[in-house]
């Protein structure tokens, strides 16, 4: 069984697929709660619902609510005390913490347990059988700044404590890469980037964009240099609701171009990027102006278009054509705006079916 990595596909790799397989399908990672628990069955679900279609990766996320289980678990960390309690039913109901006086955090306190989870997933993966080659296992890696921000509830505290969160994340990444090498790809996941820019006045964007890009670049620089990454930008999807309204793609493009510049300076390859183009409450826009910023995206950035919305299939088809017209090239892959963890099972099935249809759709550019 061979391993295919699509973060930086060559033309030969794309041509190796069937002539109609213009794009791959990308899954952000999570599945509805009723489908989680059994690693083998979760991975089988992704394979069974994408027949004759290339996948960018094979995920197996354990928390359908992304980091909520981890966030709740921080209540047991002795160095922390709650500032606000909550059940995470929505963004106003999330717990936050502060450091107890005279205490400090260790990276082990903040571990997401990704290394142990990945070992279990890879053991289950070895029992999978399919006629096609499997893509690499996709490991969900929340951005350290996001973890710090959700923990403390304020940007200032998040920046202050960022180093220990970064170390906790990278401990897992290095362990996983050492154990599994190129059989895994890492997906850095961040709603905080776009949420921060949404809350920042546009005259201050240049400084904010540089700071955010520098933070993300540091993660890649301190990780294994031969690891394969991709990036998942996000509007948030707790309760299938976004953190902020959909406006345009200018923030995403400005951040990604700044990150590209930082990584180029460090001689680190730019990962493929999942850009959300709809939300749990907003259909993919059909106004061409929404996608216009994509013409300014660096041409060597591979785009995963997060525009597959099973409740708006016509708009999804239109959005794909508009996005590729502005990019002047086919996207690497199509995807939903976020994971399927907040969907009902029939909706997840419908989304996967629409993604496969769009993946095989003839490119217009």
Q: Residues of each region from the PLM?
A:
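Conserved, mostly hydrophobic/aromatic
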Residues: 169-170, 231, 273, 334
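Active-site-proximal, glycine-rich beta->alpha crossover segments in alpha/beta enzymes
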Residues: 89-179, 185-211
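Active-site-proximal loop/turn and secondary-structure-junction residues that shape catalytic pockets
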Residues: 143-147, 190-194, 235-239, 277-281, ...
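Catalytic-face loop-and-helix region of soluble metabolic enzyme cores
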Residues: 261-365
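Acidic, His- and aromatic-enriched active-site or binding-groove loops in soluble protein domains
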Residues: 79-83, 156-174, 202-225, 249-261
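Acidic (Asp/Glu)-rich catalytic clusters
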Residues: 46-48, 87-89, 123-136, 177-181, ...
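N-terminal basic, low-complexity leaders that serve as flexible interaction/assembly modules and, when applicable
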Residues: 1-92, 360-361
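Aromatic-lined glycan-binding groove of carbohydrate-active enzymes
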Residues: 213-301
